[in-house]
Regions:
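The feature encodes the CheY-like receiver
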Residues: 15, 57, 81, 85
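Acidic catalytic/metal-coordinating carboxylates
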Residues: 33-34, 58-64, 84
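Helix-turn-helix DNA-binding segment
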Residues: 132-159
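Short amphipathic alpha-helix used as the core "switch/output" element in two-component signaling
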Residues: 36, 40, 62-74, 91
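C-terminal output helix
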Residues: 85-87, 101-115
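Two-component/phosphorelay signaling modules centered on CheY-like receiver
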Residues: 3, 11-30
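Active-site beta3 strand of CheY-like receiver
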Residues: 6, 45-52
Length: 159
């Protein structure tokens, strides 16, 4: 499966412009008009990155991001916002967003960020030299150890 820039924005003009922009730079993309529409097609094995509007009708971009995180998605997320909100940007990045871009944006900078996010995603999915050994060791964990490991990975304390 090829990496794709998954665009979720309720503004049709933005979706069309981003699709055209990415195509002009040879970046495959697909666009959805809402978070709900994206969720219908979402699978845990999607590759690439998610370009996500912060404020949309219905489910917001932040709500979608939180839901995908709860479902274990590791797809890098680049938030787009027409409302330059520094606290919002900081909160999104602290929660694990790959980047936060204000509208209007510089086309080349956005495409470069999307390409970096896609490269980051590909590097995490490529098996490392010790992948088999790591998998074998993880399979030895007890159910309780797996539970603790999952909570630690989400930033919870082990107490």
């Amino acid at each position: 499966m090829s990496p794709i820039a998954h665009i979720v924005d309720d503004d049709e003009a933005i979706r069309d412009a981003l699709t055209w922009l990415f195509r002009s730079r040879h970046v495959d993309s697909r666009a959805w008009p809402s978070a709900e529409a994206f969720l219908v097609d979402w699978r845990g094995d999607l590759r690439g990155c998610l370009v996500l509007d912060v404020r949309m009708g219905g489910m917001s971009g932040l709500q979608l991001f939180d839901l995908l995180s709860e479902r274990g998605s590791r797809l890098p997320v680049i938030f787009l916002s027409g409302h330059g909100d520094i606290p919002l940007a900081v909160a999104a990045v602290k929660k694990g967003a790959f980047d936060f871009v204000e509208k209007p944006f510089n086309d080349n900078e956005l495409v470069d960020r999307v390409i970096r996010a896609m490269q980051f995603d590909a590097s995490r999915k490529a098996p490392g030299p010790n992948a088999a050994a790591t998998t074998a060791r993880l399979n030895l964990l007890t159910p309780r150890e797996r539970e603790v490991r999952a909570k630690l990975a989400r930033g919870k304390l082990n107490k």
